[in-house]
Amino acid sequence: AGIDRKNITDIGSKSPDEVVEKVRFIVTGSKHGYRPKSVRRKDIPKPNGKTRPLGIPCIWDRLVQQCIKQILEPICEAKFSNNSYGFRPNRSVEHAINRTYTMLQRMNLHYVIEFDIKGFFDNVNHSKLIKQMWSLGIQDKRLIFVIRRILKATIKMPDGSLIEPHKGTPQGGIISPLLANIVLNELDFWVASQWEENPMAVSRGKYRIIGKTE
């Protein structure tokens, strides 16, 4: 739960029409426009002993993000690289692994190169992201305004202090995985162009290029 400590069951008594009306009011009802509540920071332990920072929005802000995702996803899916499998509908890590095995067996490929993007979610450039959205055809200024507000939502740390983010998109947000795919889509196509003769599969966060021995 976010800083309001509420979850989906807390609004379960409302009818669908009431939920839609509430979301509409949150986004457009104020003269200042949409203002998401602070995102709650929570550190999740990782197997290597480090922690993964999550940013958990309040329940109504999560619903706003879900609405945005349902608008953006079909537009983006039509323009994403076919080599990308992470955070996409009807695709998964298992699909990427299966494709890798198929290529290894059928195309006389013998090695895999893997690389990772360290701290990706925490370092997304907001201006670059908005430009990439625009180039994908997402050009509704009201929608972009709301997404900017989501990216700039203050982060409430465990000690109660507030941080104003200038980069990054919080892991834990509904639309963060989709925004990540928008940012990395250009890289997906660039990697494919550099290794045209050798196929690749992307399980988001890690790139695997499969090739032949010399």
Give the ranges of each region predicted by the language model.
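Non-catalytic, polymerase-adjacent accessory regions of viral genome-replication enzymes
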Residues: A1-D17
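Conserved polymerase palm-domain catalytic core
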Residues: S38, K42, K79-N83, R88, ...
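Residues forming anionic-ligand binding surfaces in small-molecule and nucleic-acid pockets
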Residues: K42-K50, L72, I163
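Conserved phosphate-binding loops in nucleotide/dinucleotide-binding enzymes
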Residues: P53-L54
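Active/ligand-binding-proximal structured segments within catalytic/core domains
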Residues: L63-L72, L179-V183
